[in-house]
Amino acid sequence: MPGKQSEEGPAEAGASEDSEEEGLGGLTLEELQQGQEAARALEDMMTLSAQTLVRAEVDELYEEVRPLGQGCYGRVLLVTHRQKGTPLALKQLPKPRTSLRGFLYEFCVGLSLGAHSAIVTAYGIGIESAHSYSFLTEPVLHGDLMAFIQPKVGLPQPAVHRCAAQLASALEYIHARGLVYRDLKPENVLVCDPACRRFKLTDFGHTRPRGTLLRLAGPPIPYTAPELCAPPPLPEGLPIQPALDAWALGVLLFCLLTGYFPWDRPLAEADPFYEDFLIWQASGQPRDRPQPWFGLAAAADALLRGLLDPHPRRRSAVIAIREHLGRPWRQREGEAEAVGAVEEEAGQ
């Protein structure tokens, strides 16, 4: 990716509610309980999965065809079952870099979410070999979204609409289960066909239950929500919310529409492009519209300014995308897909 060219109520009731949320690091009690329930369900699944791990060397069971992807923590291979010939994707995590608990966690999160059509289907087979842990998923053979983004151009508008609808549906599904995805970026969106009609989320190693306390571990990137860059409300960190995913989705959609990031870091004092965006966000005046946004239509402006609101409690939820699917998102393109057709492909 190139650079940033690269019923109102009594006042007392509201005050009490704000005080309660402040004591919970910005979460309501209901939100906190939802995350705790998700965490307990994952712990139960991990306990069961640990008891059913297949202990064998991968090459005894599967034949490697070719690599599908490589990351910091492991690799993904296209394999076939030696007896049945079934093609599968195998994610292999080396033991020196992955604990058993870390492996079981990612494996079980994927299992719990794979029923959605825009999320990679994980199969209930975990393998422990001498030097690695592995699990199997459906194979998606056309690479990730990054390879399809043309620098300074992005994707064709119909493909952006389809991608937005499907990713929003997948994220809504994740959030409804008390989880926050936390790693939305082109590299984690797999493309199912050369025409970019179907997309699937993958890689759930960073997914966490809502309310998990999180501190920023490294320098911020464009997808990092600004609340993660601020001092956390609790000593242990920021309780994570679905608003983190809404922010990342807004940044991703900007990239798909323009072919570059809206900014490098969401820090006004360090990034003039982000500072310009904040000025426009506050004023709403056309004269304050930053140059990188000039090619976008009014519907895209409204959508992205909602998803990229710097205040997480005011930020639009990912489902806001549905309101804008039937409109043009670029000024230079007049085509707009019918909302029903796009939503049908969202896999809801």
Swiss-Prot record:
Region Disordered: start-end pairs: 1-25
This protein's record includes keyword Transmembrane helix: no
Give the Protein kinase domain ranges.
Answer: 62-330
Q: What is its EC number?
A: 2.7.11.1
Q: Name one GO molecular function term.
A: MAP kinase kinase activity
| UniProt: ATP binding residues | L68, G69, Q70, G71, C72, Y73, G74, R75, V76, K91
Keyword Disulfide bond assigned to the entry: answer is no
Question: Tell me, what is an example of a GO biological process annotation in this record?
Answer: MAPK cascade
Q: What is this protein called?
A: Serine/threonine-protein kinase SBK2
